[in-house]
Design a protein with these regions (language model features):
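Solvent-exposed, acidic/polar segments of extracytosolic/periplasmic ligand-binding ectodomains
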Residues: 32, 523-524
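Low-complexity, intrinsically disordered or signal/transmembrane-proximal segments
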Residues: 11, 524-525
Length: 528
């Protein structure tokens, strides 16, 4: 059948519609990227640096310069650490500066997720995927933290998208693209290895490019192993791999890595809630540490609504990916990392925490995006509106409510610095690194909170520390794991006038004079 030629300078109607649709989708991706930038850069430096961020600063040589030996000891995140060191060299070590690399990675994640959505769940899921990525409170939180998780997510997303492309075309350029992205993810955080089941399946699965993929997989595997080889000695030294031996029973006397709950019964539900709502969509982390049951009761209505909405979207999303014949990928992407980290936690090798399975988050977002893509217009608008309201509340809390923020070491130490007299010192208890960072130039000593489990020993060592100088500023934070009963705080309260103790959002401060300290053998006596 003869098809008449189009008039000069014109295009077929279908091509015109396709071009217009592509332009609209590009504008959507750009708009979502702009929103992501606004959310991630807004008040980037308003929270204090907390203890985990201090580990990054130490590895980056701050204050000072990066040292190769410190990089080799940093088994998680040498790439991110180098970025932090570079930004600090150029712009200083303010909070917003050292967090800026994470924010930029979080912004770049939006177009990366657009690519991943297009090659995995389909073009119709791209728009919901980019908006979910832009607004996710969980992603905003880690984009505003001086840790490597935003880098990991960006590298893992790009590597997975590149891998899915190899099923269609496995040329040298496509393989190199995967290798570079996988290398970036590996050098950002070793949690990228949790995607090994999914990536191995995708390298080996049947298809027209299987032969080329098998050859390329060997080269890529050797290249990645060579890349991480400088960090292998540190991995062997830092982690106790014997704990992962099959059939090993955890001795009763073996201390948990983080208090009694290396693997809390609610760990997986909490991870799913955090993926959906971040750490400000319900009770704050400090509320949960103080009283999990009380925190859940106080926020039950909000938790129930979030669970209902995201539970429904999750169920619809699983049906949508099943219709696309992607359930095998989904199981390997979601279940395998959770099982691996659960095994680590059960053997007291690593604590179960949402950030340790963050490589599964892109899959969660794409499952929800598939649900939105398959909904009718009215249902899509209603559910999108509910999610937008829930996330707006969570993001506002994160930005403006101190109880949902990180511990406020900056305010605590500025007050100490303003009131500290000559000859006095600071005693950092619980998490000393942030106290030392914000107390630079002051005399700061450490006291190990783990001894709080032996009250007599605690009283003796604290008394000795407090009696060493005329006055001591005791700065206590993150005591939940080592001193859940609050023995140290109670002991200090009994010896300090009310006028000389105060708190600053997760940080408690006591100004203890030598004369305030009573005999360690009389814990109930008070000088007041």
């Amino acid at each position: 059948m003869h098809v008449p030629a189009s008039p000069a300078g014109s295009q077929p109607a279908t091509a015109t519609r396709s071009t217009a649709s592509d332009s609209a989708l590009t504008r959507t991706i750009l708009a979502a990227t702009l929103v992501a930038a606004l959310l991630r850069l807004f008040r980037l430096g308003h929270q204090s640096l907390w203890i985990d961020e201090q580990f990054t600063l130490v590895a980056a040589g701050l204050p000072g310069h990066v040292v190769w030996r410190d990089l080799l000891d940093n088994v998680h995140g040498p790439l991110h650490t180098l970025a932090v060191a570079l930004f600090a060299l150029l712009f200083g070590d303010a909070e917003w500066v050292v967090r800026l690399p994470s924010a930029l990675a979080g912004i770049a994640l939006v177009p990366a997720m657009a690519w991943l959505a297009r090659v995995w769940t389909g073009r119709d899921t791209v728009a919901p995927a980019v908006w979910l990525t832009a607004g996710s409170p969980f992603l905003v939180w880690y984009s505003q933290e001086c840790r490597n998780y935003a880098f990991l997510l960006l590298g893992a997303t790009l590597a997975t998208a590149a891998l899915f492309e190899l099923a269609r075309h496995c040329g040298r350029g496509a393989v190199l693209r995967y290798l570079l992205a996988a290398a970036a993810a590996t050098l950002s955080n070793l949690s990228f290895a949790l995607l090994l089941p999914l990536h191995a399946w995708r390298w080996l699965m049947p298809g027209p490019t299987r032969r080329a993929r098998l050859v390329s997989a060997a080269v890529v595997g050797a290249g990645l192993l060579l890349l991480v080889s400088p960090w292998l000695p540190a991995m062997g030294r830092i982690w106790d791999w014997s704990r992962l031996a099959p059939g090993r029973e955890v001795p009763a006397a073996e201390a948990g890595l983080r208090g009694p709950h290396t693997m809390h019964p609610a760990a997986v539900p909490f991870a799913l809630h955090a993926f959906a709502m971040g750490y400000s969509g319900g009770p704050s982390l400090r509320e949960l540490r103080r009283s999990p049951e009380g925190a859940v009761r106080a926020h039950f209505a909000e938790l129930a609504l979030a669970g209902l909405v995201f539970g429904l979207l999750g169920a619809l999303g699983l049906r949508a990916v099943a219709r696309r014949r992607l359930l095998a990928d989904t199981c390997l992407w979601l279940v395998a990392p959770a099982l691996a980290v659960s095994y680590f936690a059960a053997n007291n090798f690593k604590v179960f925490h949402p950030r340790y399975i963050v490589v599964s988050l892109p899959c969660c977002l794409l499952v929800v995006a598939a649900a939105f893509a398959d909904l009718g217009p009215r249902a899509r608008r209603v559910l999108a509106g509910v999610v937008a309201v829930l996330w707006a509340v969570a993001l506002a809390r994160m930005a403006f409510e101190p109880k949902y923020g990180r511990e406020d070491y900056r305010t605590a130490m500025s007050k100490v610095r303003a009131s500290m007299a000559a000859g006095e010192r600071v005693l950092a208890v619980g998490a000393p690194e942030p106290v030392e960072w914000y107390g630079r130039g002051l005399t700061v000593a450490r006291w190990w909170l783990g001894v709080a489990g032996r009250p007599e020993r605690m009283q003796q060592t604290l008394t000795e520390s407090l009696a060493a100088v005329p006055g001591t500023w005791v700065v206590l934070s993150r005591a939940e794991d080592d001193d859940p009963e609050g023995r140290c705080a109670s002991w200090l309260d009994a010896r300090t006038p009310v006028a000389r103790r105060w708190s600053a959002n997760g940080v408690q401060v006591w100004h203890v004079m030598r004369a305030d300290v009573v005999a360690a053998g009389d814990p109930q006596q008070s000088p007041n």
